[in-house]
Structure formats: C-alpha cells, structure tokens
C-alpha cells in the first residue's frame, strides 16, 4: 500500500499537532512546541463514525485485564516532568497506566495501550492535557470554594479551617482532634483531594503531636496565633519527628523578632513559606529574603500576581477586612500600609520568572481567589515574557521551558512540598488520573473536562434538555464522578501517624486515605524548574529589592490576557 502524504495543517486538524508544530496558549504571548510524538504516523487511533476505533480495527477483542478503562487519544501533554509531548494516555483503575501508542496489537505495530470492548474513549485531538492543579493555601471558609476550584482545573486543596469561624477567616488551621475528625468526615462529600493543616502555634510539642495523630497532613504557623521563634522551633521539631510539612505566615509586626530571628529559628530545616512576598503577611518589609534560602520552599498567593495598576488599591481594602482592622484606628492603617509595598510586589513577578519563587496558591477568601490560581500563573508568565523577553533556556521558536517552569508552580512543586508527589502533581505513569483537558484557545482559563481518579467529575456542559450536549447555556456542572460512592475517585491526605491511629479507622471514612511522606529532606533544589537561590536584599527605607545585587523592578501591567475577553458570559 502506498503512503498517503498530507500537509501538516491537515494532519493537525485531524489528529492534533505533532513534533515541531507550535501552538499559542489562549490569548497569551506564550508559544509551545511539541517536543516528541509517541503515536505512529499512519497508525493513529481516533473515535467516531468511519474512524479507527472500531471492532477488529483499532479496537481488539481482549478482556479488561489486558486493556485500559479509558484512553485519551492524540493528546498534547503539557507537564513539568513529562514535558510537552503528543501521546495517547491510558487510564486503568483510576490511575495513569501508560503514556504512548494506543490501538489493537493484533493488527497494529508499537501498541503500548490496548483498546478493547471495555475501553471508553475521550478525544484528545487538538486538546491540551495537564495534571490537575494543587492549591496549597486554602482557608476552608465555605465548601462552595471546592466547586469553584474544581471548575478552574484544581483537583487537590490543602489548607485548614472549620468553616466561617473567625479563626478560619484569618488562619489556615484546623485545630484539635474534634475539628480535624469532623473535617475528615466532611471531606468524603467532595470530588476533590483534600488535606488539612493543624494549628502549629505551640511552645510545647504534645498538642502538636496530638493533631498530627488526629489526621492532619501538616501544621501551620500563623502570626495571628503567635509565630514566635519558640513556636517555630517547636513546630519544626514535631514535623521532623512525624514527617509532615510546616507552612508559615510569619510576624508582620516584628514583635517577637525580625526576619533574621525567624530564619534563625528554622535552623536549616525545611519549611513552606506562604505569600513570601509579604503582602499576605510576614515580616515587614523583608520577609521576601526567605526565598533565597536553600531550606525554604516559597510560594505566592494569587492577588499580588501579576503586578498590575490595580494591585495596591485592592490590597489595602482586602487587608482591612481579612484581619479585622479598623480604618478609624491609626495603628491599623499603619499595619496595613506596612504590608502593601509596590517594590516587593513588583520583585515577586521577577523572582517567579527566575525560578526563585517555587509555587502559586490562592489564600481562598482570605486575601485570595480560589478559582484564579491557574489564570494568575499564566498571566504572570505572559507579563514576564513581554517585560523580560525569552528565558535563556528557551529559543526564538518557543517558550517551552518558561511554560514548564510556570506549570510546575501549581502541580509538581506543591505536591513535592507536601509529600504527595507519589500520588498527584504530574502526568506520569502510576499517579492518580487527575487530569484536565483544555481547548488551546481556553487554556488556563476555562477547562473542558476535569477528571478525578480517571472519572469525569466536572465539565463545561450545555442544556441538559437539549437534543445534543452543546446548546447554551453552557456552564460548569458536576458529572457522575461527583456523586455517590464515585467520590472514592478522590483521596484524603493525612499523616502516617494518623493512618496508623485506630481512631481514624473508627471514623468509617469512605474516601481512600493516603499518607504523606518525604517532606523533611526536601531542599529548594528539589523544586522542579524553580530551584534558584539568589541572595535577596531589601532596603529598609526605600524597599528596593535586589537579587545577587541586581535591582528587581518591573512596571505594573495595564492589560492582561485570560481576562475580560473570556468572561463576557
């Protein structure tokens, strides 16, 4: 049989882009290029009338033991670990079973993903597939946040709280065994991987150990509970003992010491610093110095990202509400103004682009927007490309390295930081099939499908009474993976000590429980594409930020992609 040659455009329209093809991400200035294609030209599989995946053709006769449950065909994977590659993706029992070439091995060569009568198909042609996002800074103020996050492409939420309690409004802590157990029970109701942080502010270890054994996956130090050097040291000691992560919101007012005292209390131990720029809280004006240390894993919260002409004004109002400040009290105004600094906010964008800030998160309803972690990440990447040009690792043809650096900030790096990278955080074989499918024109802003544990949990869906799925109104709706016992496609993360605790088994939880591990030996060098450790200085009077002696300054954006164009309806 003679080969049939078609143009690259025709091929891309039929099977999606292949090696060397380039694609714009939504309306940004970010361009990606396919690095490798695992499918085989002429042997591609595609579902539909007159297409390949039919009995005796692309679909064979093998039983489910030898076939995948679901195949995503001809997908363009964008992942910090796997890269930017074209492949078929096979899902089995809720996990990623294979990334390669799907089909019928009885008649096709090179098949690594077997399609049989028991296989469902999701068309990935022309679609981008990413790992589900991980938001590691959640105030669990209301359960409706979970829907907002899921519909944005987030599939794992880590944080603390008990609902709209005053403590939860300000701090990401689920304190004490009773609250922890109730939140673990509530977690069973949601199509989202959840993990809770206990209150880490204590000068003696017993109450911290009690919380770790009760079911939290980590501990949170917050200045509103008193983040003193003694509390920091105690919390990190318990964390080292029990292999859980510590997150910190340090002392904005410098009451119990300056930034040097806090960094000294770390004693070189691993810690996740929240909103490390400082607008969300932390030693004023120089907590941003922490981002240069090898034991500090720094994250941002999304309101300061990227720096725009509106950032300063909205932050002052947010701060007054979130921390119960009174605009009629001079001391409260001074507190607010000390935290909101143009210079450090501008520097934050650049430190992200350098790979010195490793993670992005939301700070949901507590000076952060839970549905905008992914949007803000890509807006920041776009802004930095416009202002700083191509990264040294990139070529004139594409922004692949920058894209991998930025996607790592809300996928693999928070997974590594919190000890859950063995389960989530990347598109890799063996991990939970928490996958998000995007049309390229809507990348980063409005996903098409959100899979949890291999099952579709949410989708942009049209009128349920229509004759076809697409008529308006099209909006996000929960799918079958969000109901009943199918919620077991999500997991709850707890400590190993809690997993060994009979009191947890006595709760009768229905979701799988997964223990965190490997949190205490991490360093900044483990942060994928985001391991830079420049020496950061802040002038105490002018707030000028320098990294390795270079002044970090950029202009605020007046216009951004992924914004009003996508939210007219």
UniProtKB/Swiss-Prot annotation:
Cofactor annotation comment: Binds 2 nickel ions per subunit.
GO molecular function: nickel cation binding; urease activity
Residue numbers annotated as active site: 323
Catalytic activity: urea + 2 H2O + H(+) = hydrogencarbonate + 2 NH4(+)
Gene Ontology biological-process entries: urea catabolic process
Subcellular location: Cytoplasm
EC number: 3.5.1.5
InterPro entries: Amidohydro-rel, Metal-dep_hydrolase_composite, Metal_Hydrolase, Urease_alpha_N_dom, Urease_alpha_subunit, Urease_AS, Urease_asu, Urease_asu_c
Residues with PTM N6-carboxylysine: 220
Binding sites annotated in the UniProt record for Ni(2+) 2: 220, 249, 275
Residues given in the record as Ni(2+) 1 binding sites: 137, 139, 220, 363
One Pfam family per UniProt: Urease_alpha
Domain of life, source organism: Bacteria
Subunit-structure text: Heterotrimer of UreA (gamma), UreB (beta) and UreC (alpha) subunits. Three heterotrimers associate to form the active enzyme.
Name of the molecule in the record: Urease subunit alpha
Organismal lineage: Bacteria, Pseudomonadati, Pseudomonadota, Betaproteobacteria, Rhodocyclales
């Amino acid at each position: 049989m003679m080969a049939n040659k078609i143009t690259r455009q025709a091929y891309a329209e039929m099977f999606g882009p292949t090696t060397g093809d380039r694609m714009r991400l939504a309306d940004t200035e970010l361009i990606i290029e396919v690095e490798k294609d695992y499918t085989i030209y002429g042997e591609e599989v595609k579902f539909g009338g007159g297409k390949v995946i039919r009995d005796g053709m692309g679909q064979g006769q093998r039983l489910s033991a030898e076939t995948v449950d679901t195949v995503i065909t001809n997908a363009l994977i964008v992942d910090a670990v796997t890269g930017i590659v074209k492949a078929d993706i096979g899902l089995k029992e809720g996990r990623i079973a294979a990334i390669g070439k799907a089909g019928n091995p009885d008649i096709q060569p090179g098949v690594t993903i077997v399609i049989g009568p028991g296989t469902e198909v999701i068309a990935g042609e022309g679609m981008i597939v990413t790992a589900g996002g991980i938001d590691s800074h959640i105030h669990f103020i209301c359960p409706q946040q979970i829907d907002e996050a899921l519909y944005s492409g987030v599939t794992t939420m880590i944080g603390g709280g008990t609902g709209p309690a005053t403590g939860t409004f300000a701090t990401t802590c689920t304190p004490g065994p009773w609250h922890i157990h109730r939140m673990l029970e509530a977690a069973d109701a949601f199509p989202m991987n959840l993990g809770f942080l206990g209150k880490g502010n204590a000068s003696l270890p017993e109450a911290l150990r009690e919380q770790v054994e009760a079911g939290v996956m980590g501990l949170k130090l917050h200045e509103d509970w008193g983040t003193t050097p003694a509390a920091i040291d105690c919390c990190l000691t318990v964390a080292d003992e029990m292999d859980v992560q510590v997150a910190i919101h340090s002392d904005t007012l410098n009451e119990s010491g300056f930034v040097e005292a806090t960094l000294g209390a770390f004693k070189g131990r691993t810690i996740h610093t929240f909103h490390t720029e400082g607008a969300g809280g932390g030693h004023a004006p120089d907590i941003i110095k922490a981002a240069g240390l090898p034991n500090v894993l720094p994250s941002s919260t999304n309101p300061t990202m990227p720096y725009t002409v509106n950032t300063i004004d909205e932050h002052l109002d947010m701060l007054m509400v979130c921390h119960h400040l009174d605009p009629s009290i001079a001391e409260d105004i001074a507190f607010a103004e000390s935290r909101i600094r143009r210079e450090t906010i501008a520097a934050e964008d650049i430190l992200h682009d350098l790979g010195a800030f490793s993670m992005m998160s939301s700070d949901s309803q507590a000076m952060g927007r839970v549905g905008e972690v992914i949007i803000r990440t890509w807006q920041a990447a776009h802004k930095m490309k416009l202002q700083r040009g191509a990264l040294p690792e990139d070529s004139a043809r594409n922004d692949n390295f920058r894209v991998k650096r930025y996607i790592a900030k809300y996928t693999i790096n928070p997974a590594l930081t919190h000890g859950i990278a063995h389960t989530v955080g990347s598109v890799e074989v063996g991990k939970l099939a928490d996958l998000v499918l995007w049309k390229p024109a809507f990348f980063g802003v409005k996903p098409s499908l959100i899979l949890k544990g291999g099952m579709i949990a949410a989708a942009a869906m049209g009128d349920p009474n229509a004759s076809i799925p697409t008529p308006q109104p099209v909006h996000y709706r929960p799918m079958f993976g969000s109901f009943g016992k199918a919620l077991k496609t999500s997991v709850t993360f707890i400590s190993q000590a809690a997993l060994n605790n009979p009191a947890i088994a006595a709760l009768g939880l229905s979701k799988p429980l997964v223990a965190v591990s490997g949190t205490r030996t991490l360093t900044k060098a483990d942060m994928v594409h985001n391991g830079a450790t420049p020496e950061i200085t802040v002038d105490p009077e002018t707030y000028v930020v320098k990294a390795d002696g270079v002044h970090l300054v950029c202009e605020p954006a007046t216009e951004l992609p992924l914004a009003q164009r996508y939210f007219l309806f």
